[in-house]
């Protein structure tokens, strides 16, 4: 997808905020713990290749990604620190990962057997992390016998280096710690079955650290907090207070490209879902659902100049319209998303409007949007 650098619409990413969030996370670790910055999904929409060096400078000890291709992107960006893929990859890609010093997760004995054939053929050793399903229900070993079989298979097997063992918490961002405690107990049980001792045991995610639920983890996988966003932010929920202040890094700005007056009874947008109740001023903004600004944003208020104005009519593929209180000139700045967490158009408020989480909103902003990096 081409990046539209010649239109007046861009995501602004505050590098000073990214640095500060990374430093704060690093400072909050216990002695000996490593900080692995999670930059999957293009750093939650913020730009992984651009931000990873910034995080590295601010103290990152390694990086986590969702898939091998994301790890390869970091290597091309000259990142040399450890990279862990969190999602399962085809066994056929084991050699490519090993050749680029990228660690892969393991969830089955069958995968190991297939990967070993590939590695033996190329004369390579792969760093692996054993994934444990302690209660997320997603990937990982959950049955004792399966895990014991893998443990036995890895004894003396030089095709693999058991670098880590990990799990992921389903509810570390909840005030109710009962399920969190259950997962910790289940993980420790699985750990007791392992005689091939990993270099790193890691369970802590952003929520576990921000809400002081650290479980003696060698690595902290710090994700959404890097971008200044509170993981405890489901729609309608009460945010848990983080252990340190977070600084949102993303804002989304554009401008009015066209302003016109319409008369009473005139329709706006596909399906004419807005009908003017009187003579009205309508402004057009050159952003649409093809950029990730989806149709459900109809009715949401964006900041035009100093005034919050509702989106009227259905959001189009490449444009949307706003109802203005009066005539304003084309070229007037429009702030779609504010980096101020208290603003009515913050990423959190946008997520509330869409009945989702801010993770999803940030990730849906795609590569057609230019990303401008400020405050270097």
From Swiss-Prot:
Its cofactor is pyridoxal 5'-phosphate. GO terms for molecular function: alanine racemase activity; pyridoxal phosphate binding. The keyword Isomerase applies. The active site is at residues 40, 270. GO terms for biological process: D-alanine biosynthetic process; peptidoglycan biosynthetic process. InterPro entries: Ala_racemase (IPR000821), Ala_racemase/Decarboxylase_C (IPR009006), Ala_racemase_C (IPR011079), Ala_racemase_N (IPR001608), Ala_racemase_pyridoxalP-BS (IPR020622), PLP-binding_barrel (IPR029066). Its EC number is 5.1.1.1. One of its GO terms (cellular component) is cytosol. Keywords: Isomerase, Pyridoxal phosphate. It catalyses: L-alanine = D-alanine. Substrate binds at residues 138, 317. Gene3D superfamilies: Alanine racemase, Lyase, Ornithine Decarboxylase, Chain A, domain 1. The modification N6-(pyridoxal phosphate)lysine is found at residue 40. Pathway: Amino-acid biosynthesis; D-alanine biosynthesis; D-alanine from L-alanine: step 1/1. It holds the Pfam family Ala_racemase_N. Catalyzes the interconversion of L-alanine and D-alanine. May also act on other amino acids. Belongs to the alanine racemase family. HAMAP family: Ala_racemase. This is Alanine racemase. The lineage of its organism: Bacteria, Bacillati, Bacillota, Bacilli, Lactobacillales. The gene is alr.
């Amino acid at each position: 997808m081409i990046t539209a650098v010649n239109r007046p619409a861009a995501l602004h990413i505050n590098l000073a905020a990214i640095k500060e969030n990374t430093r704060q996370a690093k400072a909050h670790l216990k002695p000996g713990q490593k900080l692995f910055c999670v930059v999957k999904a293009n750093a939650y929409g913020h730009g992984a290749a651009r931000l990873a060096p910034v995080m590295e400078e601010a103290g990152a000890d390694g990086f986590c990604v969702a898939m091998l291709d994301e790890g390869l992107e970091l290597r091309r960006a000259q990142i040399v620190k450890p990279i862990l893929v969190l999602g399962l990859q085809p066994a056929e890609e084991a050699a490519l990962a090993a050749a680029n010093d990228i660690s892969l997760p393991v969830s089955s004995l069958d995968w190991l057997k297939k990967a070993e054939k590939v590695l033996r053929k190329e004369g390579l050793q792969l760093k692996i992390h054993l994934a444990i399903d302690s209660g997320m229900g997603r990937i990982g070993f959950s049955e004792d016998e399966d895990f014991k079989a893998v443990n036995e298979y890895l004894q003396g097997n030089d095709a693999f280096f058991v670098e880590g063992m990990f799990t992921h918490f389903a509810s570390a961002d909840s005030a109710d710690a009962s399920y969190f405690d259950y997962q910790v107990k289940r993980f420790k049980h699985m750990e007791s079955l392992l005689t091939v001792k990993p270099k790193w045991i890691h369970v802590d995610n952003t929520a576990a650290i921000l809400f002081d639920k650290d479980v003696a983890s060698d690595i902290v996988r710090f994700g959404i907090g890097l971008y200044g966003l509170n993981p405890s932010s489901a729609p309608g929920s009460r945010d848990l207070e983080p252990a340190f202040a977070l600084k949102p890094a993303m804002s989304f700005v554009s401008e009015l490209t066209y302003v016109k007056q319409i008369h009473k009874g005139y329709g706006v947008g596909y399906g004419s879902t807005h009908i003017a109740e009187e003579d009205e001023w309508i402004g057009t903004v050159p952003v649409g659902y093809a950029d990730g600004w989806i149709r459900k944003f109809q009715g949401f208020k964006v900041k035009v100049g100093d005034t919050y104005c509702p989106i009227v009519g259905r959001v189009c593929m490449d444009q949307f319209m706003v109802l203005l209180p009066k005539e304003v000139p084309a070229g007037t700045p429009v702030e779609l998303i504010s980096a101020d967490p208290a603003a009515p158009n913050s990423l959190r408020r946008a997520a509330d409007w869409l009945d989702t989480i801010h993770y999803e909103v940030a990730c849906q902003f795609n590569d057609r949007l230019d990303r401008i990096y400020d405050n270097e």
